[in-house]
């Protein structure tokens, strides 16, 4: 990470800390109390040593008093450290919670193009793993950095009070450890950043494989998947080992420096005792302070190394937060009301990639209650057209109108609530069957829910489930067949009954008998509602009012089933290829 970017990351972290200024101040005060009490103990210890070795009889009364003071200081230090750790946990976990909430909210505001371009595993890794890594480093910083810096300042003050010249030796030699730590941390940060990126790749790959494990097994792709996994795993191991290597040599290198400092202080101190400049007790206190002075440097170098990992993780989260959200609703956007189903596309152009046009000069006018079937080869723009109708993407040129309103001038919520969708890929949330059917209408009554299930021909199999409508569905509906999942998705739409419908390959995964029952249910559902139907099996769209035959983003043919067969064109060829006798 470049220096400027690292500074910006640090500045943004500070912004997240601002709401918890009081807690941070409390942590700082507790750190000062803890350090002050800790540093007072060597003074008492030195006095105790002088009390024992002084000429004449040992002053036991004073010695006992000193021991009591030491015990009290140790007890108060432990209490202050416990409170400080509790406060630090509050700060870091709250910052992590705030960051995770913001990241998840921002993810929902991102355009579909961003989500399509990134694996779900990478996004999960940024929101979960990277934020955990960041808060772990932040917690370590609060816990050890505060006390470390205060301890260094405090010990210098106490040592100056005992002997300024020996203190000068300590202060002069100490910066060498910082040079060593800085040299190593620059190299470790790059490795931690690559480790974080590779961890995200691994999460995405494992998530993809587990989500499609049946397909992997069917195509005997296990060995190839294992090779891909091994490659990612090798990369992760390489970057992890390199990061660990650089971080692991920081502490030994600095410890070596501090051992030299300690030895130098011991020699200089002994000479001072011989000259009578300081007492043996003061030397004992000074050596204790030297040890306490060097110890925070060891901890701080460890914190710096860990903080490199934390910064790398935070940078990945901020990359997500910096992505431009989808174009917000216009300030004067109005909610669609009294939607009857008038839809019009005027000279629409669209492409996912600027250089590769997909839909060009597309025109279509749909009257309320019409059933518009869209057919054509893969990649002709059928699903893209649905994405544009729902405003998952905005058109490049032209406009789409609903009830005479440009959909860019109405709220997305009112537009999308006007459509009911049965997608090619079914989606069910982890929860009960009841919760899934009522997903679009949480306030539905029991009678309404059961009626919707019956109309979708789902009531029968639901009743046979162990707990009926209260049966728990696993993530993605793993304990249901593909047909059952699709029936529940259809029941969900049956319950809300919006004024317009989008059926994208709605029955492509259902057996023939179930398809016939669903087609009958669809007839009831689509009556009086504008419906857009996409299907490869032409048997599902023969009753459509208008069939659009698309190719390369253009309408090749348009008409009813009978009219298009009579033309003996593209639709007729497609129909004959599916229904011609073998």
Which residues does each predicted region cover?
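Transmembrane helix-loop-helix hairpins at lipid-water interfaces of multipass membrane proteins
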Residues: 24-83, 87, 161-165, 276-280
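Juxtamembrane loop-to-helix connectors within ABC transporter transmembrane domains
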Residues: 9, 17, 49, 84, ...
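ABC-type nucleotide-binding domain
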Residues: 322, 329, 336-582
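Transmembrane helices of ABC transporter permease
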Residues: 19, 23-36, 73, 77, ...
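Helix-loop-helix
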Residues: 59-65, 158-175, 242, 246-315, ...
């Amino acid at each position: 990470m470049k220096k400027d970017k690292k500074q910006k990351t640090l500045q943004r972290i500070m912004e997240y800390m601002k709401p918890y200024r009081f807690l941070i101040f409390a942590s700082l005060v507790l750190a000062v109390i803890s350090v002050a009490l800790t540093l007072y103990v060597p003074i008492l210890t030195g006095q105790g040593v002088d009390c024992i070795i002084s000429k004449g009889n040992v002053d036991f009364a004073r010695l006992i008093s000193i021991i009591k003071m030491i015990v009290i200081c140790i007890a108060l230090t432990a209490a202050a450290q416990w409170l400080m750790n509790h406060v630090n946990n509050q700060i870091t976990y709250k910052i992590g919670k705030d960051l995770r909430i913001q990241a998840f909210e921002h993810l929902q505001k991102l355009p579909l193009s961003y989500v399509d371009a990134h694996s779900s595993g990478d996004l999960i890794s940024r929101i979960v793993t990277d934020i955990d890594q960041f808060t772990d480093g932040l917690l370590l910083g609060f816990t050890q950095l505060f006390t470390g810096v205060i301890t260094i300042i405090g010990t210098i003050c106490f040592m100056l009070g005992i002997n300024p010249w020996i203190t000068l030796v300590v202060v002069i030699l100490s910066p060498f450890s910082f040079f060593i730590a800085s040299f190593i941390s620059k190299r470790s940060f790059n490795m931690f950043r690559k480790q974080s990126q590779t961890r995200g790749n691994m999460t995405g790959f494992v998530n993809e494989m587990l989500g499609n494990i049946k397909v992997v097994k069917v195509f005997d792709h296990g060995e190839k998947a294992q090779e891909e996994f091994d490659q990612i795993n090798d990369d992760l191991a390489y970057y992890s080992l390199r990061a660990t290597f650089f971080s692991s040599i920081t502490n030994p290198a600095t410890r070596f420096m501090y051992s030299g400092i300690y030895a130098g202080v011991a020699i200089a101190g002994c000479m001072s005792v011989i000259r009578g400049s300081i007492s043996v007790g003061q030397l004992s206190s000074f050596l204790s302070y030297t040890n306490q002075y060097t110890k925070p440097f060891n901890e701080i170098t460890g914190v710096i190394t860990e903080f490199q990992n934390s910064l790398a993780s935070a940078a990945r989260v901020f990359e997500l937060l910096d992505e431009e959200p989808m174009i917000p609703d216009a300030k004067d956007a109005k909610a669609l009301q009294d939607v009857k189903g008038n839809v019009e596309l005027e000279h629409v152009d669209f492409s996912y990639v600027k250089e590769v046009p997909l839909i060009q000069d597309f025109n279509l006018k749909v009257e309320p209650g019409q059933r518009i079937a869209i057919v054509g080869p893969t990649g002709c723009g059928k699903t893209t057209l649905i994405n544009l109708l729902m405003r998952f993407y905005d058109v490049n040129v032209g406009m789409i109108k609903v009830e005479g309103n440009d959909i860019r001038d109405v709220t997305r919520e009112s537009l999308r609530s006007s459509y009911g969708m049965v997608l090619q890929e079914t989606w069910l949330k982890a929860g009960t069957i009841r919760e899934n059917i009522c997903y679009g209408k949480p306030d539905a009554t029991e009678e309404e829910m059961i009626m919707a299930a019956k109309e979708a021909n789902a009531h029968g199999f639901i009743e046979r489930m162990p707990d009926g409508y209260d049966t728990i569905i696993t993530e993605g509906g793993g304990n249901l067949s593909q047909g059952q999942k699709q029936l529940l998705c259809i029941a969900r739409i049956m319950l809300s009954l919006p004024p317009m419908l989008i059926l994208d390959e709605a029955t492509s995964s259902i057996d023939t008998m179930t398809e016939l029952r669903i087609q009958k249910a669809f007839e009831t559902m689509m009556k009086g509602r504008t419906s857009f139907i996409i299907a490869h099996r032409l048997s599902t769209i023969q009753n459509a009012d208008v069939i659009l035959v698309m190719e390369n983003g253009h309408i090749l043919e348009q008409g009813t089933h009978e009219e298009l067969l009579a033309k003996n064109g593209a639709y007729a060829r497609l129909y004959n290829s599916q229904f011609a006798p073998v």
